[in-house]
């Protein structure tokens, strides 16, 4: 328990230090030259700010969610080996899988996984 207290204390101190450093650093003043596109000293060939596909963003967010699911399920075998309450752990993992399966079905039925616009 003492090591957890140390970790929380160090993390809190690090957050406070980074916030204070960020407040005291000079802010960057954007001007016309900094906002313009730069291609090795030549005039840009086209627009540097292309429109971003919202579908791609949605698929990327879904990938992150399901990647997080895998990261949460990976420690499950260790929980089975080192825990006496495996029945509880099993149902927690099954609940996580069921919730994410329903979320995937919802996205699929709403057309969130269709790539064409």
Curated annotation (Swiss-Prot):
It comes from the Eukaryota. Keywords: Electron transport, Membrane, Mitochondrion, NAD, Respiratory chain, Translocase, Transmembrane, Transmembrane helix, Transport, Ubiquinone. Its main location: mitochondrion. It is found in: Mitochondrion membrane. GO terms for cellular component: mitochondrial membrane; respiratory chain complex I. Pfam families: Oxidored_q4 (PF00507). It catalyses: a ubiquinone + NADH + 5 H(+)(in) = a ubiquinol + NAD(+) + 4 H(+)(out). Core subunit of the mitochondrial membrane respiratory chain NADH dehydrogenase (Complex I) that is believed to belong to the minimal assembly required for catalysis. Complex I functions in the transfer of electrons from NADH to the respiratory chain. The immediate electron acceptor for the enzyme is believed to be ubiquinone. It comes from Branchiostoma floridae (Florida lancelet). It is a multi-pass membrane protein. The chain crosses the membrane at residues 1-21, 56-76, 86-106. This is NADH-ubiquinone oxidoreductase chain 3. Belongs to the complex I subunit 3 family. One of its GO terms (molecular function) is NADH dehydrogenase (ubiquinone) activity. Its EC number is 7.1.1.2.
């Amino acid at each position: 328990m003492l090591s957890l207290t140390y970790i929380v204390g160090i993390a809190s101190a690090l957050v406070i230090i980074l916030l204070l450093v960020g407040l005291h650093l000079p802010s960057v003043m954007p001007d016309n030259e900094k906002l313009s596109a730069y291609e090795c000293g030549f005039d840009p060939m086209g627009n540097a700010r292309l429109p971003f596909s919202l579908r791609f963003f949605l698929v990327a967010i879904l990938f992150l969610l399901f990647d997080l699911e895998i990261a949460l399920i990976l420690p499950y075998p260790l929980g089975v080996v080192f825990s006496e309450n495996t029945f509880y752990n099993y149902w927690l993992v099954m609940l996580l899988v069921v919730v994410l399966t329903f979320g995937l079905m919802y996205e699929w039925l709403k057309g969130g996984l269709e790539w064409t616009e």
